[in-house]
């Protein structure tokens, strides 16, 4: 009560921010007559004038009124469009490192030109981020004439572009691209082997369109660049055959409940749990299939990977549904984005889940991948010096934007008052009754010539509604992940009189629905339209537009509530743009996922008590309140998941930054010999310490062990025992110095043969490759640690603190391994003259031919039998190069049969 009273007196924070900015809007408006007097050349010259002023130390902020006035005037001349005052406010909000909530149809694309131009004046580059390639290309091409008129270059960053084209796009003043592509380019740049391979500049200013979709909906999905791991597709197929034998039970076994099934599903947490009965059956089936030995347990350490396969297969069958979570197209399983309804080509689920779904659907199973580099959007966008975003629905997530990204949300008022009617929800008992009511509503609306947009939450639901509409003889368009190619065209014409469009989730976001349809789309469809044709198209459109306005504007039907209120608001926001009339209504049933999982049982109890007859709907504030509470519950849970993900990823992020900084420094120098010399000292000190403890008695020294270690790991033959026998005065300190000096001398002799320049190049390559290899292994180890760390909670330990502690220890160990591996590799390198290499190659070819002849005579030749036996053993188990050779010769595999294979 008191807060409301204070807000009335002093205004909300939002009001105060807008009040401050309106003063600047007045200044911009006052400059308009002055700008109108300038010639085109004088207006264009303003850009160089602003750049010169910034060069002399003037701040970008001080240029706001003048720069915005210049962009507004240029837009009038180039597009014939003048920025509204609310768009100027939006531009200032975006420049202020804030999120601008601007309703659908308020011209966010044109608003973005203001802060993009202003921040590009510094010459550091501006990245405009969109949700898909179509919008990136459309916005770049639409705004290019304006920016080029003002002397600014525009680049488009699309997937699959060659590196030189990408470098050129990033070098432009303003670059348009998708969130995925910017993130992947960052990861690829940090895997480059030369500075010339990198494409990005320093990350300066990011302007994110549909910021809620990118920074919230996709925050749980990390960007991963991966390489192939071992092939285990056969195992997925075998385990997949077993899963259909299992029966699902309603809930998990407990002290009070013992079910008859084999597994239970927790829909809320999206987890599957095997029951005792299920575990016994799975083990029996695995033994029958010959995958596991009799008497073995699925939980024994040797069967960890098998358990992983079973869990993945069970999740694929119980939690992931075709045409809801994924589609199958051209023999490939493609993920469907749960928030936008779009397909995510090229994205794959991790932890073997994607392979399990492929096995379930009977398509070709692609190899599992190993992570080479990864980053979350949360951490990528926090790398920018300056970040801002815009969307039609941000206010419900303002707390998350503030706590995670330190971005305030400012609600920008609409240019004209909103007059859309949001009708109360109607709740039915069954899904069938609800669908029937939706069909009746559509019939009624279209009979009056009112266009209808039906929003569904999955492809499956959109197809159910489509079938019912077809039965009822109602012509309609379907827009979902299966038909997204003609997305913009369908959305543009969704405002036609009596048009019915079914859209999955928010597919088609970013394209305005114009009442009466889009006359621009009709003109674009003609090859060379004449002035008369264009005038006729506009006149026809005006008639349709007026008819739709008279019918009540666009009507929105939601077939069920989404988990997030924000996505419901996005659907509603498609109607009532720029002060147009419109209406919206959500139809729900007690069988909807949200109602079933999260809304309390009281709602269904209340409906039964009211004695509702089939086909009747309930419309009551209590029900609406229960639904809103259910949505809040889900939003809060999803926020906690994202926050927790970020807290864990922050640990990896600190390490990632350290590694990438080190790697970039390494890339930018041509001579790393000082670093090599420094780490050589550290490595030899640590190696000697293991066999000659510092300040210890000679009796404690392990000289044979040290000699063997130096030979095996550094290819150094050092008669240390002989030195000590011949030189009694040789003590610990001088011995250490001699070992190090000898290693340096051997290394320098190699350098003399190949030349200093070649050696420097080789050193740098070894350091980069070793760093990448160990970082890849470290990422895999961090993944394993992350998956099991929650179990520490049972030991009364904080899993987050344990994760931080262990991952730091692993990181420190990785850095030590890096030093050791680099020095070991450089020490072992064999320098050969060209003629020696040729002779060795000849010898290798002769041995290969001899081996081929031996294998042809294998039934007569014992030696070939050994080779065949060896091949069988290596097929079962991968033999390391330094392992003993299975033929029994006593030699290492690489020096015996490994050399022949």
From Swiss-Prot:
It catalyses: ATP + H2O + cellular proteinSide 1 = ADP + phosphate + cellular proteinSide 2. One of its GO terms (cellular component) is plasma membrane. GO terms for molecular function: ATP binding; metal ion binding; protein-exporting ATPase activity. GO terms for biological process: intracellular protein transmembrane transport; protein import; protein targeting; protein transport by the Sec complex. ATP binds at residues 87, 105-109, 512. Keywords: ATP-binding, Cell inner membrane, Cell membrane, Cytoplasm, Membrane, Metal-binding, Nucleotide-binding, Protein transport, Translocase, Translocation, Transport, Zinc. Its EC number is 7.4.2.8. Gene3D superfamilies: Helical scaffold and wing domains of SecA (1.10.3060.10), P-loop containing nucleotide triphosphate hydrolases (3.40.50.300), SecA, preprotein cross-linking domain (3.90.1440.10). Induction: Repressed under conditions of excess protein secretion capacity and derepressed when protein secretion becomes limiting. This is regulated by SecM. May bind 1 zinc ion per subunit. Part of the Sec protein translocase complex. Interacts with the SecYEG preprotein conducting channel. Has a central role in coupling the hydrolysis of ATP to the transfer of proteins into and across the cell membrane, serving both as a receptor for the preprotein-SecB complex and as an ATP-driven molecular motor driving the stepwise translocation of polypeptide chains across the membrane. This is Protein translocase subunit SecA. It comes from Salmonella typhi. The lineage of its organism: Bacteria, Pseudomonadati, Pseudomonadota, Gammaproteobacteria, Enterobacterales.
